[in-house]
Amino acid sequence: MNTHFTYVLQCADQTLYCGYTTDLEKRLATHNSGKGAKYTKTRLPVKLLASVNFDNKNDAMSCEWWFKHKLVRQQKLKLIKNNLIKEKFLEYLLAKQK
């Protein structure tokens, strides 16, 4: 079984980038080589701030979407600092099911 990751990068201009991968080290290297996402190409170098692992692609990609579209920057930074991304994402999923 593959591990699927949602990851958060800090770009050189201090902006955040969130993505999905199955190979965290390779993806970070790809970003820093300038061959990653269009957004990060002009904001190098990038550094990994956080990563969350999931057992399946759907959960990891759903977490990426939630992080990008449901949170503002201050919320994102607080979750990163307190290592609570996965916990709060799972709470979001549970609340959505009710």
UniProtKB/Swiss-Prot annotation:
Pfam families cross-referenced by the UniProt entry: GIY-YIG
Name of the protein: UPF0213 protein llmg_2010
Alphabetical list of SUPFAM superfamilies matching this protein: GIY-YIG endonuclease
UniProt family annotation: Belongs to the UPF0213 family.
Gene3D superfamilies referenced in this protein's UniProt entry, alphabetically: GIY-YIG endonuclease (3.40.1440.10)
Annotated GIY-YIG domain residues: 2-79
Signal peptide start-end: none
PANTHER family attached to this UniProt entry: UPF0213 PROTEIN YHBQ (PTHR34477:SF1)
Superkingdom of this protein's organism: Bacteria
